[in-house]
Every structure is written in structure tokens, then in C-alpha cells.
């Protein structure tokens, strides 16, 4: 199930750096994290769905690259995003 537009708008509003910001690394990582979290129950129920798992791994990889970029460019924003999304312990 895809992320609903209302939920997507809320995520963008929460993590945007400006009023019309939809492409900052924070927004992209937050949207990817939401999609990854929505897909997790699907893979617990459908363990042999390798085709969709490949898409999930692609999303995880893309999120990792965005986080690496953010960490290299602005460590404070990186730490704030990690804490807000609860990605690291």
C-alpha cells in the first residue's frame, strides 16, 4: 500500500526546511523511512516475495546514501534527523 497523500503532506510539512521544500535530504529520508516501515509487515507475511524485496533494498540503499550526504555536509542536521526518525539507538 502506497503512502497516502495526506500522510505524505504531513511528513513533508514536518521535515521541510522552508515552505515549498519537498526535495531536501531530510524530507527524502523521512518519506523513504515511512515507505520502508510500511513494507516491513508485508515481508514478514510474504517471505518469498524476492521481487519486492529488491525494491525495498533499493530504498534502503538510497536512504543510506542520502544520510551519508547529510552527515558529510551538516552533522547537526543529520543528528537531528536521526533522532526525529528514531533510526539509530
Swiss-Prot record:
InterPro entries: Ribosomal_uS15 (IPR000589), Ribosomal_uS15_bac-type (IPR005290), uS15_NS1_RNA-bd_sf (IPR009068). The keyword Ribosomal protein applies. Keywords: Ribonucleoprotein, Ribosomal protein, RNA-binding, rRNA-binding. Pfam families: Ribosomal_S15. SMART domains: Ribosomal_S15. The keyword RNA-binding applies. GO terms for cellular component: cytosolic small ribosomal subunit. HAMAP family: Ribosomal_uS15_B (MF_01343_B). Belongs to the universal ribosomal protein uS15 family. One of the primary rRNA binding proteins, it binds directly to 16S rRNA where it helps nucleate assembly of the platform of the 30S subunit by binding and bridging several RNA helices of the 16S rRNA. Forms an intersubunit bridge (bridge B4) with the 23S rRNA of the 50S subunit in the ribosome. This is Small ribosomal subunit protein uS15. The gene is rpsO.
Amino acid at each position: 500500500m502506497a503512502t497516502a497523500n495526506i500522510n505524505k503532506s504531513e511528513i513533508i510539512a514536518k521535515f521541510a526546511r522552508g515552505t515549498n521544500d519537498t526535495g531536501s535530504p531530510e524530507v527524502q529520508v523521512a518519506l523513504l523511512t515511512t515507505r520502508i516501515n510500511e513494507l516491513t509487515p508485508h515481508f514478514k507475511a510474504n517471505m518469498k516475495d524476492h521481487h519486492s524485496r529488491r525494491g525495498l533494498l533499493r530504498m534502503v540503499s538510497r536512504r543510506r546514501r542520502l544520510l551519508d550526504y547529510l552527515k558529510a555536509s551538516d552533522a547537526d542536521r543529520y543528528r537531528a534527523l536521526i533522532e526525529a526518525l528514531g533510526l539509530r539507538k
